[in-house]
């Protein structure tokens, strides 16, 4: 007898892009094995949206009375249904993919022997941007829609999460991976790795093989969200150094390693949390000018006003393929590319969907994730920036030192040479906060402009010097920094940056800072006592960053500087009057960022 197929119910919030992913998967998987259900809706045919069978209310009710539906539901003033004959397809071994509602999950789970929920998600700012682009709802309506809380997943349901926060091609690739990996989920009620998961829940350490088994079952959708939540919660409480190494090594088994014909391949990672601090766009050209290979892949912003990829995208193409990266390294010795298209991790899709909403302290888990991806990307040497300060991920110096030691120890376990530097994260680095404004600072440093932010220049030179010292011909980091300084001062780094931009694909219309501006001034005479990086980033995001690359904050003062009443503290840039008004509202006496820059009397 042929084994039953799996029923995939696709759910997710408005703006997640479910229809687009289903259409893309249909083009990829639409064959004898996968069937994509056509919904029956009491909506006129030809209406915008998915292809559906349109019926009148009376006909829908008649079909429902005749038992022609597998399941029905109400939404947006309409009635939706999936036909009963889909069950017959499952019985022949076909897999069925249907766009559905969270409200019918429990009912379908009881009816179908092999049932998987595919939960399509995206960060709230991405959802808001997509909904607003439809032009059917106002700004307040958009935010209310995004803020809606989804009901919890019923117990015992197999759920696979797909993060659709990037290009359509990548989203479709993730979605089709979820369908392929989840096809057998319902047939494995007891994953082979369950005993390892139970051991971790009891606080026992696991080895490399155990972690590999758990991850493989998690990717295949054989664990419920509740089981994975319990596992990750236990892992954040008890994950010793040897386990982090074991976890990192296990993760490398899920991605083929990229091989480079280079003795030294450099990479860099920052734990983030500091506004500005766009040193990568300076460090990479210096290292390239020296001659080391540095295929740098970087992320987009999640909660900050800009990621490295967001900033680089204001001047060059960043959605590079593996072939593009090899070409850039061959021609320019480096690249600064977006990592979403290059080292996407199905493991992270599954785990981040749990750790982020719960706010789990996953730093040790993150070390394994970060370094495993560096290893599979072909890096031999990695430098890590670990800022600490009141608004960063690490508030205490001791915690930062411990994490630095862990990075270096795990690096050894993966055969990597890792140098982790603990840095001051108590204040922003540079003046610009937001993609275009940060790139303006970068250009000033590369051009040795007299107005270039010295803190940005000095931090970039320190990291570039440490990287150059990876070369065995360089005796020390101090010598490396002298070499880096010379490369910057003589213009070699600027020339290398231009080569990288040209090789990646120069943007014909570089993004400029937003034309809508508002200056925040000192309320009284005194000294600048503190700059709250979290609030500064919040204002920049309210102004539109990084969605609007020209939006952000231009800091016009520094900590310790004496200011007069009415003297400018910072300038808000936005690309629209509405975004500017939203950001300015945050700075008022009752606003969330009223103390972004604190001025104390002398």
UniProtKB/Swiss-Prot annotation:
GO terms for biological process: 5-phosphoribose 1-diphosphate biosynthetic process; organic phosphonate metabolic process; organic phosphonate transport; pyrimidine nucleobase metabolic process; pyrimidine nucleoside metabolic process. Its EC number is 2.7.4.23, 2.4.2.4. Residues 1-187 are annotated as: Ribose 1,5-bisphosphokinase. GO terms for molecular function: 1,4-alpha-oligoglucan phosphorylase activity; ATP binding; ribose 1,5-bisphosphate phosphokinase activity; thymidine phosphorylase activity. Pathway: Metabolic intermediate biosynthesis; 5-phospho-alpha-D-ribose 1-diphosphate biosynthesis; 5-phospho-alpha-D-ribose 1-diphosphate from D-ribose 5-phosphate (route II): step 3/3. It comes from the Bacteria. Coiled coil: none annotated. Residues 188-602 are annotated as: Thymidinephosphorylase. PROSITE patterns: THYMID_PHOSPHORYLASE (PS00647). GO terms for cellular component: cytosol. The keyword ATP-binding applies. SUPFAM superfamilies: Nucleoside phosphorylase/phosphoribosyltransferase catalytic domain (SSF52418), Nucleoside phosphorylase/phosphoribosyltransferase N-terminal domain (SSF47648), P-loop containing nucleoside triphosphate hydrolases (SSF52540), Pyrimidine nucleoside phosphorylase C-terminal domain (SSF54680). Pfam families: Glycos_transf_3 (PF00591), PYNP_C (PF07831). Keywords: Alkylphosphonate uptake, ATP-binding, Glycosyltransferase, Multifunctional enzyme, Nucleotide-binding, Transferase. InterPro entries: Glycosyl_Trfase_fam3 (IPR000312), Glycosyl_Trfase_fam3_N_dom_sf (IPR036320), Nuc_phospho_transferase (IPR035902), P-loop_NTPase (IPR027417), PhnN (IPR012699), PYNP-like_C_sf (IPR036566), PYNP_C (IPR013102), Pyrmidine_PPase_CS (IPR017872). It catalyses: alpha-D-ribose 1,5-bisphosphate + ATP = 5-phospho-alpha-D-ribose 1-diphosphate + ADP; thymidine + phosphate = 2-deoxy-alpha-D-ribose 1-phosphate + thymine. In the N-terminal section; belongs to the ribose 1,5-bisphosphokinase family. In the C-terminal section; belongs to the thymidine/pyrimidine-nucleoside phosphorylase family. Type 2 subfamily. Catalyzes the phosphorylation of ribose 1,5-bisphosphate to 5-phospho-D-ribosyl alpha-1-diphosphate (PRPP). This is Bifunctional ribose 1,5-bisphosphokinase-thymidine phosphorylase. It comes from Cupriavidus pinatubonensis (strain JMP 134 / LMG 1197) (Cupriavidus necator (strain JMP 134)). The gene is phnN.
